[in-house]
């Protein structure tokens, strides 16, 4: 008598974990992750060692201590991480035709997407955590306390990293080639949106509340006490006449809401596009 053995397929959650694990292994094999962490740690060590070596004492305030180290490079680091781990996450499956091996498996496309995004999420959390907690702990050793403002900035940086990754996945799900997705993501976050923020806000007088990079300004503004506020200044120009400049300051509560909105909307749209996208073309 023949015995039929049926094998139960893993649940969606188990498959998400599997995709996440293999995606992280892929980044380890390509040395992207190791390279990012090495660059991050070397930069952090330099930022900690150079000031006292050139005769500049550390700030005595724990918030200023952390801000003096993290504020210059936080958003740049996040943009680099998003470019490396989110921008080509989907498009590379089509460009390299690896989707022919991946997509026929009994795994839902949304499961593949969520597994990949979870790996990027974990990498972003790791990178931002190292970037913040080394100076936070160093500040504890130097000043004797930990600033709650530094913790709040850390939380905002995490949220921005996840939101920027979501935008990167959306771009990756649309673009045909990985190079185009990488270039567009990098310049969108580092140049295009910030320039747009300046034109619309500083010169146009309209607060760019829709902009992810504008709301990311709260990462650094949160260190200031009291928290800064928006203002308008009028400057006389040679030859007569005045020029008005607007300085808009994003509010923390609004920034959190906008970033969460980016995370939800960008991922939902990206999943829909990814599910409908075919290998041909």
Locate each region found by the language model.
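Terminal transmembrane helical anchor/hairpin motif
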Residues: 50-65, 190-273, 281
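Alpha-helix N-cap/start motif
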Residues: 108-110, 114
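Short helix-to-coil transition segments within interhelical loops
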Residues: 101-108
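Secretory targeting signals
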Residues: 2-10, 38-40, 44-89, 114-185, ...
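Aromatic- and glycine-rich beta-strand/loop motifs that create alpha-glucan
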Residues: 1-38
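Hydrophobic alpha-helical segments typical of transmembrane helices
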Residues: 86, 97-98
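Short, charged juxtamembrane terminal tails flanking transmembrane helices
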Residues: 2-5, 273-281
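Transmembrane helix-loop junction
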Residues: 26, 92, 105, 136-140, ...
């Amino acid at each position: 008598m023949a015995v039929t053995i049926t094998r139960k397929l893993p649940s969606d959650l188990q498959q998400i974990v599997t995709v996440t694990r293999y995606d992280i292994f892929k980044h380890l094999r390509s040395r992207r992750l190791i390279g990012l962490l090495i660059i991050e740690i070397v930069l952090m060590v330099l930022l900690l060692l150079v000031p006292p070596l050139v005769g500049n004492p550390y700030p005595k305030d724990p918030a200023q201590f952390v801000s003096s180290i993290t504020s210059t490079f936080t958003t740049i680091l996040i943009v680099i991480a998003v470019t490396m781990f989110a921008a080509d996450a989907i498009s590379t499956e089509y460009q390299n035709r690896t989707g022919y091996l991946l997509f026929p498996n009994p795994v839902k496309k949304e499961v593949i997407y969520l597994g990949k995004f979870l790996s990027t999420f974990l990498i972003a959390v790791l990178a931002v955590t190292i970037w913040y907690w080394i100076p936070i702990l160093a500040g504890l050793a130097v000043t004797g306390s930990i600033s709650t403002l530094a913790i709040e900035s850390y939380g905002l940086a995490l949220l921005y990293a996840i939101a920027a990754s979501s935008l990167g996945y959306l771009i990756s799900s649309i673009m045909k080639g990985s190079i185009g997705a990488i270039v567009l993501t990098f310049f969108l976050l580092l140049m295009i949106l910030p320039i747009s923020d300046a034109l619309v806000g500083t010169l146009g007088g309209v607060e760019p509340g829709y902009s992810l990079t504008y709301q990311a300004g709260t990462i650094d503004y949160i260190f200031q006490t009291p928290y800064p506020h928006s203002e308008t200044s009028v400057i006389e120009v040679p030859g007569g006449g005045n020029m008005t400049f607007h300085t808009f300051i994003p509010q923390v509560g609004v920034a959190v809401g906008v970033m969460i909105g980016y995370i939800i909307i960008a991922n939902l749209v990206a999943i829909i596009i990814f599910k409908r996208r075919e290998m041909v073309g």
